[in-house]
């Protein structure tokens, strides 16, 4: 489980990125890099870090499912992820 402060920080960064997304797109299209550099640091999407949606774990994140490998494995064994089953060959 990630620290609550880290999870909240990531959520704030996501909100900031969403708030400035359109403005950033316009500034980039106009090649106004000076104004772009005046925007907040956290307005850049590269500052975001993918985290597990269940417990906030930052490592071993699986994009397709939005969770870490540990939670994916647990939920898959419990049969709570539709269409996922243990491989057997």
Swiss-Prot record:
Annotated organism of origin: Pediococcus pentosaceus (strain ATCC 25745 / CCUG 21536 / LMG 10740 / 183-1w)
Protein name as it appears in the record: Small ribosomal subunit protein uS14A
Pfam short name (any one): Ribosomal_S14
Any GO molecular function: rRNA binding
Gene3D superfamilies: 30s Ribosomal Protein S14, Chain N (4.10.830.10)
Primary role: Binds 16S rRNA, required for the assembly of 30S particles and may also be responsible for determining the conformation of the 16S rRNA at the A site.
Lineage: Bacteria, Bacillati, Bacillota, Bacilli, Lactobacillales
Gene that produces this protein: rpsN
Subunit annotation: Part of the 30S ribosomal subunit. Contacts proteins S3 and S10.
Record's GO cellular component terms: cytoplasm; small ribosomal subunit
